[in-house]
Structures are given as structure tokens and as C-alpha cells.
């Protein structure tokens, strides 16, 4: 992996690696809570993914084809900005919270992607056995701690009426939004990633980053 590339074909690869549809990510910081959250899918969409410092989440390609995943290779180097691959179970969710972005613009009532680990998925599935399909829930979610010490509290109520998304909001096509890039595209991503982070946090269950977007 070098720090530059040459030629038109490599330029196209690099451009493809830095383009794509931005997707909004649902997350809570320790001590935060969210009310009125709704899971919009019947089941989780299951992947493995790496977090790249400053870039967001990228689906791991190890074992998908004949090529090795460059993110897996880089994640094993000291002080890498690439996190090791994590099991992720992904949902479309409705987040009614209001927030102000870095540009000073206010947003609320948005569809976002929620990535959960297996521990939280088991909690959700247990509640599904009790309350029925996910889309019929209205949730209050709170979180304490981070990494392996994360504790979630999820209260579920059954919805009393059919839910309709606000105008302009729609579900993400998760197969499209989470589709893996090619090895060449991932290498192009790495070529533009500063080595400023550590991969010491190996938690593949509840690790989250304070970032509200992801580039697939």
C-alpha cells in the first residue's frame, strides 16, 4: 500500500472509493437516551465491518471472494487507524430526536442505520418473542458505558396505530448501502487515511463511534 497512485484507471478507483451515498447512523453516547425510536425492518441485516478513523464504516470483504481484505491486513499493524472486523447486525430505524449538525442546521424525525452487536441483538430478539414484530414497537432506549462495559436499557411499548414515515424519508436499501467495496477501492481509502488512531479496542459487540454518517 503506497501513499500515491498513477494513471487514469487508478484515479477512477480512488474517486469511487471516496464517493457513495452517505447514510445517517443511529447512536447514543453514554448517559444519553432516546424516546420514540422505532425499528423499521422485520429482521437484521448481518455483516462484518471495519471502522476507519475519519472515514466511517466499511464492510469487510474477507472470505467474500478470492481477494484478501486490506482492512483486515492493516488492522493488525501497530497503531493502525483501522479497527478489526466486527460482527454487525443492522436495522433501519426511525429516530425522532432533534439535533444540530456541524453546519448549524437542525434535523429531526429521520431514518437512520443502527448497527448492533450480538449481545444487544439477543436482547432485542428476546423482546420480539414477547412483544411481536419489531416494526410494531415504540422504544425508549438508554445507554451507559462504552465498549465491553456498555449497558443498554430498552423499554418497549406496542404501537397503537400504523406508522407512516415523514415526507421525504425512506428506508435505506441495506444491501446497496452496505455493499462491500473492491480491494482496490479499499486500498484507495487507506491511502487517504491518516495514521492517528489505535486499534486497541477489540470489542466486536458494542463498540460505537461518535459519528452520524457512514460511507459505504
Task: Pin down the residues of each PLM region.
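OB-fold ssDNA-binding interfaces and closely related basic DNA-contact patches used
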Residues: 1-130, 173-216
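Glycine-rich loops and low-complexity Gly/Arg-rich segments
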Residues: 63-65, 139, 165
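Hydrophobic beta-strand residues in large extracellular and virion-surface proteins
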Residues: 91-93, 139-141, 154
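OB-fold/S1-family single-stranded nucleic acid-binding modules
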Residues: 116, 144-172
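Flexible glycine-rich surface loops and low-complexity tracts that mediate binding to linear polymers
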Residues: 134-148
Amino acid at each position: 500500500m503506497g501513499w500515491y497512485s498513477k494513471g487514469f484507471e487508478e484515479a477512477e478507483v480512488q474517486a469511487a472509493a471516496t464517493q457513495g451515498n452517505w447514510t445517517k447512523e443511529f447512536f447514543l453516547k453514554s448517559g444519553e437516551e432516546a424516546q420514540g425510536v422505532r425499528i423499521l425492518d422485520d429482521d437484521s441485516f448481518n455483516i462484518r465491518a471495519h471502522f476507519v478513523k475519519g472515514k466511517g464504516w466499511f464492510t469487510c470483504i474477507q472470505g467474500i471472494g478470492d481477494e484478501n481484505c486490506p482492512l483486515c491486513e492493516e488492522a493488525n499493524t501497530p497503531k493502525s487507524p483501522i479497527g478489526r472486523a466486527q460482527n454487525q447486525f443492522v436495522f433501519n430505524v426511525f429516530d425522532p430526536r432533534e439535533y444540530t449538525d456541524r453546519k448549524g442546521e437542525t434535523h429531526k424525525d429521520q431514518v437512520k442505520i443502527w448497527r448492533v452487536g450480538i449481545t444487544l441483538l439477543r436482547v432485542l430478539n428476546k423482546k420480539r418473542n414477547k412483544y411481536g414484530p419489531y416494526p410494531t414497537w415504540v422504544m425508549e432506549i438508554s445507554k451507559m458505558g462504552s465498549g465491553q462495559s456498555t449497558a443498554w436499557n430498552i423499554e418497549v411499548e406496542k404501537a397503537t396505530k400504523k406508522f407512516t414515515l415523514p415526507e421525504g424519508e425512506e428506508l435505506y436499501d441495506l444491501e446497496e448501502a452496505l455493499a462491500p467495496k473492491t480491494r482496490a477501492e479499499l486500498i484507495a481509502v487507506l491511502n487517504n487515511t491518516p495514521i492517528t488512531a489505535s486499534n486497541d479496542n477489540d470489542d466486536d459487540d458494542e463498540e460505537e463511534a461518535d459519528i452520524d454518517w457512514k460511507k459505504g
